[in-house]
Regions:
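Divalent metal-coordination and catalytic microenvironments
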Residues: 11, 28, 33, 54, ...
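Active-site microenvironment of metallo-dependent hydrolases
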Residues: 1-26, 30-34, 343-455
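A conserved active-site cap/scaffold subdomain adjacent to cofactor or substrate pockets
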Residues: 258, 264-302
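Active-site gating loops and adjacent loop-to-helix segments of metal-dependent hydrolytic enzymes
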Residues: 72-102, 157-169, 226-246, 266-269, ...
């Protein structure tokens, strides 16, 4: 945790909490890593003060599904299909990862998230080729200082994905006992499951029962369109009697109306990744369909091998995609979209917290919650002048506006710079990791063998 008492002053508080509301020239008092008071002119003395003049004070973003391990091969597939991704990343590239590649991937990837104001990350880790790979992934998250859910998945390789007969690795029991005996830590654990259809039905039943035996949440990809594969993942889960409110369903882009009804009726949550879903052809993000059923989606980055690792892109993509779906071919019908900028900010904050079962801890600024706080500079050339604070966050801001980030009251970014991070060392390790991985997959550009000149 951070400083014992911290007072953030003079900022525009966008709390994402209906009771607290928005507070111009607001103050947030933090003690021992938690928020204890929010208001104006709190009259606090003896606390470390941070002047947030010209800034929005907001909760940290929550990314509910990111394959953080892919950071060392960022850009290897900038414009690919889902078929191509499975063939290259899971069928080839992932098999060349050493534990040290996983560590730098998770460490640098978590730093990237923090740099962009993401304070909570669900790390959907399907690079568990050995126990050492798993240990390295967890250590990378710990070293970065992010709040995370480590979602333990299977190793890479096609044998784990095409109606696989291989059960989820039992090593998850060791990991649960070794690292996550308590559910109150900054990093917790979930099971990154394969839907029935990716594994066979008996394996899926085993994996769901394994998660529930360990008393951990489940995160699963469903409804992704792959060529010549027709499968109703959610219906299969339902037919096996495995639906539950402990499960987050990722994508749902090709899920049927019946399947979306099943998610809603079971109390499940959803995570959409709109940029990659349209880039790779998963299918249209089902934002409106989920909302019609009372399921408020969360947002996720997904594959950092192909997608920007910040949430501003995801918010804007979700907003404009769903709004244009309201367009009709009838000129006499007025354009009448319903999704708003406030909705997508909720997706990226409090709805993300709900998808991770962390809504009592994070996702909004309120007394009693953890001090996961972002200071967003709005006295900047791309955001000034401010009229609508939520609009400023969603429509105009980007990572360059993220001035300061706190996780449980501890500063991980201040004055636009990550705290206690040797970036030159990080970049060097990323280059070395990229070269090792991609050279073995015959994907390394010729120029990459030479060090890039310092900028």
């Amino acid at each position: 945790m951070g400083s014992e008492r911290l007072l953030i002053r003079n900022g525009f508080v966008v709390s994402m909490d209906s009771d607290v509301g928005d507070i111009p020239n607001g103050e947030v008092l933090v003690e021992d890593g938690a928020i204890v008071e929010i208001g104006r002119s709190l009259g606090v003395s003896g606390a470390e003060e941070i002047d947030a003049t010209g800034m929005i004070v907001m909760p940290g973003f929550i990314d509910t599904h990111r394959h953080t391990w892919q950071t060392p091969v960022r850009g290897v597939l900038p414009c690919c299909t889902l078929d191509n991704y499975f063939a290259v990343m899971l069928g080839s590239v992932g098999g060349h990862y050493r534990p040290e590649d996983v560590h730098i991937g998770n460490y640098a990837g978590a730093l990237e998230a923090l740099n962009g104001g993401v304070t909570t990350l669900l790390d959907w880790s399907h690079i568990n080729n050995t126990p050492d790979h798993s240990d390295a992934a967890i250590q990378g998250l710990k070293d970065a200082g992010i709040r995370a859910i480590y979602a333990h998945g299977v190793p890479t390789g096609g044998e784990w994905w095409a109606f696989s007969e291989l059960e989820h690795p039992e090593d998850i029991r060791r990991i649960r006992d070794t690292y996550f005996s308590s559910d109150d830590g900054l990093i917790t654990i979930a099971l990154a499951a394969r839907a029935p259809g990716n594994s066979n039905f008996e394996v899926a039943k085993h994996d769901w029962e394994l998660a529930r035996d360990l008393a951990i949440r489940i995160s699963v990809h469903v409804g992704m369109r792959l060529t010549d594969i027709e499968v109703q993942h959610v219906k299969n889960i339902s037919d096996l009697g495995l639906l539950g409110d402990d499960t987050t369903y990722i994508h749902c882009t090709d899920s049927t109306d019946e399947e979306l009804d099943l998610i809603a009726e079971s109390g499940g949550t959803a995570s959409i990744a709109p940029y990659v879903e349209m880039l790779m052809g998963h299918g249209p993000p089902p934002t409106g369909k989920l909302l019609e059923r009372g399921v408020r989606p969360s947002l996720s980055v997904d594959v950092v091998s192909s997608v920007p690792g910040e949430m501003f892109t995801q918010m804007r993509t979700a907003l404009v995609h769903d709004r244009i779906l309201s367009h009709t071919d009838t000129p006499k019908e007025a354009f009448a979209p319903t999704l708003t900028h406030k909705d997508v900010l909720e997706f990226a904050t409090i709805d993300g917290a709900r998808a991770c079962a962390l809504e009592d801890k994070v996702g909004s600024l309120a007394p009693g919650k953890q001090a996961d706080i972002v200071l967003l500079k709005v006295n900047a050339i791309n955001t000034a002048p401010m009229v609508d604070p939520v609009g400023t966050i969603v429509v105009f801001a980007d990572t360059s506006n993220v001035d300061s980030v706190f996780v449980a009251g501890r500063a991980v970014k201040r004055n636009g710079q990550l705290v206690d991070v040797e970036l030159d060392s990080v970049f060097k390790k990323l280059d070395e990791s990229r070269n090792h991985i991609l050279s073995r997959g015959e994907l390394l550009p010729e120029w990459a063998s030479e060090p890039m000149a310092a900028v």
